[in-house]
């Protein structure tokens, strides 16, 4: 299991709180590197000050990590990673799963739902309707 390192951001008020579920089932961690200390908004409500250098924040849900990643992009911080941590301590990188963000080109990434034709070459939907095929398979 990968060990995560970094400083926890400074909380000025409410942290938004971790759910008890995070200790019993699973929790999520997001790590990022900041060029300077700056205030950011937490996805659970409230605000915190990120430390200069490596930061580590534990969250109760993956969606909070994705939302915080969007906040970090406003600060031109794009090296964030989101991990799932199981109660046994097992750590798994979940975003970006293959090391490259989804909107970037990755030579090894397989195309998903790719159909090699232009939109004008699509078959007539009425010809497919009762044929048993799906429109995305035709």
Curated annotation (Swiss-Prot):
GO cellular component: photosystem I reaction center
Keyword terms, alphabetized: Photosynthesis, Photosystem I
Keyword DNA-binding applies: no
Protein name (Swiss-Prot/TrEMBL): Photosystem I reaction center subunit II
Summary of the function given for this chain in its UniProt record: PsaD can form complexes with ferredoxin and ferredoxin-oxidoreductase in photosystem I (PS I) reaction center.
Gene3D superfamilies: Photosystem I PsaD, reaction center subunit II
Family: Belongs to the PsaD family.
SUPFAM superfamilies: Photosystem I subunit PsaD
PANTHER family assigned to the protein according to its UniProt record, in alphabetical order: PHOTOSYSTEM I REACTION CENTER SUBUNIT II, CHLOROPLASTIC (PTHR31982:SF5), PHOTOSYSTEM I REACTION CENTER SUBUNIT II-1, CHLOROPLASTIC-RELATED (PTHR31982)
Organism: Microchaete diplosiphon
Family matches, as InterPro entries: PsaD, PsaD_sf
Lineage: Bacteria, Bacillati, Cyanobacteriota, Cyanophyceae, Nostocales
GO biological process: photosynthesis
């Amino acid at each position: 299991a990968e060990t995560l390192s970094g400083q926890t951001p400074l909380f000025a008020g409410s942290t938004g709180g971790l759910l008890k579920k995070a200790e019993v089932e699973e929790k999520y961690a997001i790590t990022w590197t900041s060029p300077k200390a700056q205030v950011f908004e937490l996805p659970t409500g409230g605000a915190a000050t990120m430390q200069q250098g490596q930061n580590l924040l534990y969250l109760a849900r993956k969606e909070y990590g994705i939302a915080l990643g969007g906040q970090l992009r406003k600060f031109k911080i794009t090296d964030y990673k989101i991990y799932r941590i199981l109660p046994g301590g097992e750590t798994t990188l979940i975003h970006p799963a293959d090391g490259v963000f989804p909107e970037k080109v990755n030579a090894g990434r397989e195309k998903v739902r790719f159909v090699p034709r232009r939109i004008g070459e699509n078959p007539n939907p009425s010809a497919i309707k009762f044929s048993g095929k799906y429109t995305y398979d035709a």
